Amino acid sequence: MYLFLMINYFVLANSFDFQGYSMNARNEKSKQKRSSSETDYVCISNDYCAFLQKNTQNLYTLPICKCPGDNECPLTWDPDDGRTLIQGDIHFKFCSSAPVGLKQCGSDDIAYTAMWNKNLKTNTSEFTGEVFCECPKEVTHFLMKTKNEEGIEGQAYKCPKLQTCTSEEICVHIYNYTNNFFEIKYCKCPDGQSCPDELNSAAETDVKKERIRYGMKCK
């Protein structure tokens, strides 16, 4: 999973064309590079340093950057540790205190951003991640904008509320990265139906070298 940004947020957010992608529909190879238990990136300040998701298959943990100084990024499922911000079904973990008092995101608000930067002066790989508002509970994570320059990659996400699925829509994609599962929800099932979580119930399966993706439809 390859989430998130910030060079100057306002410059970045207005300097490239809108692109609609879910967080796992793009850059899967790059996400897979960051899906191990280690990361080569250093957090610039009190950025979010990891993502956790407790889904139907497992507890998915994605370290993003190493906290500065003696701080360690908390990788345990503890929403009350003071270092967790819940964004939909994903727990953002912070190097120190999580932000409080954020407004709730609207459907078109940029919710969080990320930047991966190669600092040529220090020869270090740096990550900067900022959160601007709090996502509601039932949302999808949607890649709004992306920018790539030499040594820099930036992304911006919004988190619109889930709409009701049509009969042909995928309600969730379940990604299997070597028995490390991550889920992306797209819509909620109509009354009387549910989104399956058994992998053998997948409506479609897409196999690649680095992962298997299971597409579920409401039943």
From Swiss-Prot:
Keywords: Disulfide bond, Secreted, Signal, Toxin. The keyword Chaperone does not apply. It is found in: Secreted. Expressed by the venom gland. Its main location: secreted. Contains 8 disulfide bonds. GO terms for cellular component: extracellular region. Residues 1-15 form the signal peptide. Belongs to the scoloptoxin-11 family. This is U-scoloptoxin(11)-Sm7a. It comes from Scolopendra morsitans (Tanzanian blue ringleg centipede).
